[in-house]
């Protein structure tokens, strides 16, 4: 069994004997996988941006070892609650607004509850770490993509639907997913592809992606061909024509 511990005010001696005390750290089997930094919403001189800077600048400089196995970080001022990759710009930190896929989206102080119950549920946290954190095979910069909650729920729902309708028992219709512009559809497809390829239920499936736009074709082919390690298959190819 995995051992989960959430520790607050954990003292860490870092570079040049600097003592740093993150507000919260989540450990799984003794490994620090999430670091949390909180600011108070009632103090006008501190904001959630200060929490972001403290994590990604000060702690990154002074206690880099704590982030060696980091999955993601959390910043909060009580009213605004966001998570994201340690390497991401602030604009790419997002709230986790649902506990379950069919729930109503919540914001503000309620989003702290949805994050704790929705993202930090033990089985779900492990699921996010296993399948929903993406590294490209090669990159000239630090890049790590952590799923947003709509991507997590969509990929899981698609996976279960494909499984339920698999032939010969099923009708072979895995379902239709509609994603609005800017929702991160390409990453949803990437997360789903990894789930299918890594699943013990499916036996080395062949996954075919068809696009109807040249720009999307270029984007997806580059992304998938550059994600062989993440997907778990070396035979990822881009086909120019069906001829």
Residues covered by each model-derived region:
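ATP-dependent helicase/translocase motor core
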Residues: 1-211, 215-231
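Inter-Walker segment of RecA-like/P-loop motor cores
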Residues: 225-243
């Amino acid at each position: 069994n995995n051992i989960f511990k959430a520790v607050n005010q954990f003292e860490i001696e870092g570079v040049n004997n600097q003592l740093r005390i993150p507000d919260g750290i989540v450990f799984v089997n003794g490994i620090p996988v999430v670091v949390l930094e909180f600011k108070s919403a009632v103090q006008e001189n501190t904001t959630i941006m200060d929490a972001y800077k403290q994590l990604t600048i000060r702690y990154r400089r002074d206690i880099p070892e704590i982030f060696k196995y980091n999955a993601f970080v959390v910043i909060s001022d009580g009213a605004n609650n966001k998570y994201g990759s340690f390497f991401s710009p602030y604009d790419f930190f997002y709230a986790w607004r649902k506990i379950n896929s069919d729930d109503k989206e919540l914001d503000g102080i309620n989003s702290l509850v949805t994050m704790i119950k929705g993202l930090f549920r033990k089985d779900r946290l492990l699921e996010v770490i296993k399948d929903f954190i993406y590294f490209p095979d090669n990159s000239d910069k630090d890049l790590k993509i952590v799923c947003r909650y709509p991507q997590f729920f969509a990929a899981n729902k698609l996976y279960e639907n494909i499984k339920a309708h698999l032939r010969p028992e099923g009708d072979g219709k895995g379902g239709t997913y509609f994603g609005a512009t800017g929702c991160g559809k390409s990453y949803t497809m990437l997360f789903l592809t990894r789930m299918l390829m890594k699943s013990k239920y499916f036996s080395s499936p062949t996954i075919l992606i068809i696009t109807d736009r040249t720009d999307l074709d270029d984007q997806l082919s580059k992304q998938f061909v550059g994600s062989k390690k993440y997907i778990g298959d070396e035979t990822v190819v881009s086909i120019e024509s069906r001829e």
